[in-house]
């Protein structure tokens, strides 16, 4: 009998594969919508092990406290503005309809009040490129243009932590801890590189699958690897 696959072992929910959720400070999102323009103070900058971007703990003048991805250059004690009448300066939170064209923004809401969904990674940002009626056209980090409602909020500037990939990992032990804290299974060994006892694609005198890579949706867990319930594989015929 063969050994269990990686996804079968992970499915048991043992500490080896479980996310260390207790070490994360909390969700990073905007507070509930408010039509007023309020000021907030950055009281703490936090390293979240599950993210590459540092978090800023902000306390508004009405006492509401929330976490947000820190903008580049943000510091403890900084006063930021939150609302439609805020100035378009780095760290301030405004509706997209109030942000001038050509401005770099991040942590953009897809729908007003959802807390922020787009351009949240360290060093990534979206660019306000135009208007289309009740929507603002954004150029996303992928290069695609997307229309977002004018009432959706965004933070002015660029998320802190840019340039993180410039530092080499150097050794496998660093990579182990990097992915362990982010709830990612690592290392990811190819099935064809395994022995026959470890994977349906393993074994043989050279690395090859040795069987069709497509598998039925109803296949048992030990066989369910490869292209699951695929309509086609490879390039589409012209």
Swiss-Prot record:
The keyword Methyltransferase does not apply. It holds the Pfam family Ribosomal_L2_C. GO terms for cellular component: cytosolic large ribosomal subunit. GO terms for biological process: cytoplasmic translation. GO terms for molecular function: rRNA binding; structural constituent of ribosome. Residues 1-34, 197-238 are annotated as: Disordered. Keywords: Ribonucleoprotein, Ribosomal protein, RNA-binding, rRNA-binding. Coiled coil: none annotated. Residues 224-238 have a biased composition (Basic residues). The keyword Magnesium does not apply. Part of the 50S ribosomal subunit. Forms a bridge to the 30S subunit in the 70S ribosome. Belongs to the universal ribosomal protein uL2 family. One of the primary rRNA binding proteins. Required for association of the 30S and 50S subunits to form the 70S ribosome, for tRNA binding and peptide bond formation. It has been suggested to have peptidyltransferase activity; this is somewhat controversial. Makes several contacts with the 16S rRNA in the 70S ribosome. This is Large ribosomal subunit protein uL2. The lineage of its organism: Archaea, Thermoproteota, Thermoprotei, Desulfurococcales, Desulfurococcaceae.
